[in-house]
Regions:
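Ligand-binding pocket segment of bilobal, Venus flytrap-like solute-binding proteins
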Residues: 1-65
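Second-shell loop/turn segments in exported
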Residues: 2-3, 20-23, 84-87, 193-197
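Soluble non-cytosolic domains of exported or imported proteins
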Residues: 6-10, 29, 91-95, 197-204
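Periplasmic-binding protein-like
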Residues: 15-17, 61-84
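Sec-exported extracytoplasmic/periplasmic mature domains
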Residues: 17-24, 36, 40, 55, ...
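Solvent-exposed loop/turn segments at secondary-structure junctions
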Residues: 47-51, 71-73, 87-88, 108
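Mature extracytoplasmic/periplasmic domains
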Residues: 82-182
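Conserved C-terminal helix/tail region of periplasmic/extracytoplasmic solute-binding proteins
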Residues: 158-253
Length: 253
């Protein structure tokens, strides 16, 4: 995930160029609606956006699935950061910022936030089981459900994935749907990494790679292609010259 050497970036560029031939677009916003409407069959999404898409499609009895590459994936998170020196020396602003973080970290507000945005909670809940109860309420199977699985989430709530207190009895299809997206199992987390910050040199290399993928690359044209382009330009110029001469003759008459 974090290799930025020239050889790896070049290999990634070639793969992306091949994908481009069969890709609707390179983006992560309108893809949610495109998945729901069936315009596209696969879309690279953040987990919370994937949950939103799965939920929306399900309203129309259209069932989508969520998957993580076997090779690797990135562990991502949105974070609020409190500077160790405060906020420009303003004690009142620092207190307000800390109060906001504390407010957003209250288990009851965490549940409200999860319900609204579809993303995994920032905390496990500490002494409160309300967050686990909410996850169980969302994904726990009905009592009369026949095809169910035991889905351990102890790694998140207690740090022990064998903890019997944190196992959700879910419908079997949740192994590749919303529950999987919000609480990926340990084997997925073990092959996931946090993406590193690109320094200036690597950032420039990655940006150039994207330019090469998204834009037309003149360097990729063969001499036959250039010959065809040249012939086309000659034909167009000849047509323009003939048109102008014809127009000049008509005006003289």
């Amino acid at each position: 995930m974090n290799r930025t050497d020239e050889e790896t970036v070049a290999a990634a560029e070639e793969i992306l160029k091949q994908m481009k031939e069969n890709a609707y677009s390179f983006e992560s916003d309108s893809g949610k609606a495109d998945m729901v409407t069936g315009k596209v069959l696969a879309n690279y999404q953040w987990s919370g956006d994937a949950v939103y898409t799965l939920d929306q499609a399900e309203i129309d009895d259209y069932y989508l699935a969520y998957a993580v590459p076997e090779e690797s994936t990135n562990i991502w998170f949105d974070g609020w950061v409190m500077l160790k020196d405060g906020i420009a020396g303003d004690a009142a602003k620092q207190q307000a910022a800390e109060a906001f973080i504390n407010f957003m970290s209250r288990p009851d507000n965490v549940v409200r936030n999860m319900y609204y945005i579809g993303y995994t909670s920032v905390i496990a809940g500490g002494d409160s089981d309300i967050i686990y109860a909410y996850a169980d309420w969302c994904y726990g199977a009905e009592e009369d459900a026949e095809d169910t699985i035991e889905y351990p989430v102890g790694f998140f709530f207690s740090g022990d994935n064998t903890d019997p207190d944190y196992v959700i009895t879910a419908e079997a299809d949740q192994v590749n749907r919303q529950l999987f997206a919000q609480y990926p199992p340990q084997d997925v987390l073990e092959r996931a990494v946090v993406m590193q910050y690109f320094d200036q040199e690597n950032n420039q290399r990655i940006n150039q790679m994207w330019v090469n993928v998204r834009c037309f690359n003149l360097a990729s044209l063969s001499w036959q292609d250039w010959a065809k382009i040249g012939a086309g330009v000659v034909v167009v110029l000849a047509a323009v010259v003939l048109f102008l001469k014809r127009d000049d003759i008509l005006r003289r008459r």
